[in-house]
C-alpha cells in the first residue's frame, strides 16, 4: 500500500518563548467599555420588588461603591447583600476593609461578608479562582427551599459539590479572627469546602448576629404583603370584620414557621407554653375610628426568631479507677 498523505514534522529553534496566559481587556472596539462600579450598581434596579425576597451580589467587584449599592438595594427590597473581597486580600486586610466600611453604614444586618475566594475546575482541567458569592447564593437557595428562611447556609448544609478548594488556607484561628471581624469564613472541613459562618455584618449582635434573623424578617415582610393584598379595598364595618381577616392571614403565615422551628417558643419551668414565639395584634387601640375613616387598617406582629448553634463546647473529665465518673 502507498500512503497518499504524509505529515512531516521537524524541530526548529527560535529566540522567542511562548507568551504567558493572561487576562486582557480589549479596547478600541465599538461594543463599549468595561462597566464602572456605578453602572453595575445601576443594574440592580432591574431586580424589581416583584421578585420577592432573595440575595443580590456583584461577583468580582469589591469597591465600597458596589458594597454601598448592594446594601441600599437589599434594605429597600428586603433582600440580603452578599459581599466578598479582592482575591489578593489577606485575612487582616479583609477584616480591616469590612470594619472600616461597617463603621460608615446603618442596617448592615442586610449584608453578609464571605472570605476567601474559591477554586474550581475549568475547561481542560484548569483551576479557576472565582469570587465566592455564587457558591454562597447556591447554598442559600438550597437551604431555604429545603427547610426555610431560618436555616443557616453553613456547615454541612453548605458542603460544596463542584468547588475544589479555597484560594487562601483558613484554619480555626483565622476563622475566629474573621468571625470577630463580621466575616464568614470559607474553609475546607473533612475534605470538603464549606461556609463556616452564619453571621451578618451587623454590630447589633443581640438582635442580628446571625444572618438568618434578617432572612426570616425579610420572608415575613414579603409574604405578609402578598397574603394581605387581596384584603385591600375590603369594607371596614362596625363589626371589625376586616380585623379578623387580617389577623387570620398573618397567623396563617407565622404558625407554620413556629411549627417547623423557625420561631422560638417560650416555655415555663414546668413545660407549659408561655408564648408561641410570635404575636399578632389588630386591635381598636391600633385602629382608632379617626384612622379608619382615612381607610388605613394597622396590624402589629412580634416574632422571636430561632438562633443558630455555631459553636458546640464539650467538657471531658477523666476519672481514675477509684473515683466515680463525673
Question: What do the predicted segments below correspond to?
Answer:
Residues 1-35, 42, 119, 123, ...:
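Small/polar, repeat-rich beta-turn/loop motifs that tile beta-strand-dominated architectures
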